[in-house]
């Protein structure tokens, strides 16, 4: 058994959380670079919490420049067991409206300019991301959303685009009509893959702000409208977070899905051939198996 520690990665419009006891902003050093910001730690209804604003307070990092590896490594160093991503997204469905939330369970990764793995030359590893989110943690998020009175859709495919520009009409139509995606965003990849490499349970909550550019009745993405919707979504997200402790146990056994054992047989490089410099950087992420 280990103590549950929830790590919240807040996206656009969500730069802190309410109700923490003994709140402290901590600067965490990482060999993978400087995290997006200091991490807010404390307890919420007896459960240890950590909050990291993905873009930094004041929104200083674009989706492409977010230090994803440093962020996940820093949360791991803090002892986080469960990572919940909350991010602003567009919708590809009339049924998924602005103000709704989607508990994402699949991704299509279209990012092109980001470091997507902790591993590489000197220590090669291959983890499975067939099911990239944790079912147990996603269910807890769904229950917390319902408790907050949020319209939350259970399951959906997230198209991760590079950005920072929004989609063209042709791209939006492709993702919706041909690929069957449900939502679109710019930040959950490689974040979800890195969380899996770090043996962290990961869940993704998409806060819907717009219809991307496919919808004939809504036109192209309007940043002013996004910001307006974000304010309401952020308040709802904070309410959802306040319900999380009631949906999760303070101590947990091994993840039923095996998220916490994802590196068990993943490293292929022979021990005598592993690069010491890379192994030193992997002390938190892969220390259990190294």
Regions found by a protein language model. Give the residues of each.
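A short, charged, Gly/Pro-tolerant segment at domain boundaries
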Residues: 253-290
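His/Asp/Glu-rich mid-to-C-terminal helical/loop segments that flank catalytic regions of hydrolases
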Residues: 213-261
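Non-catalytic positions within long, well-ordered alpha-helices that form the structural scaffold/packing
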Residues: 76-79, 176-177, 196
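Active-site/ligand-binding-proximal alpha/beta "capping" segment
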Residues: 147-182
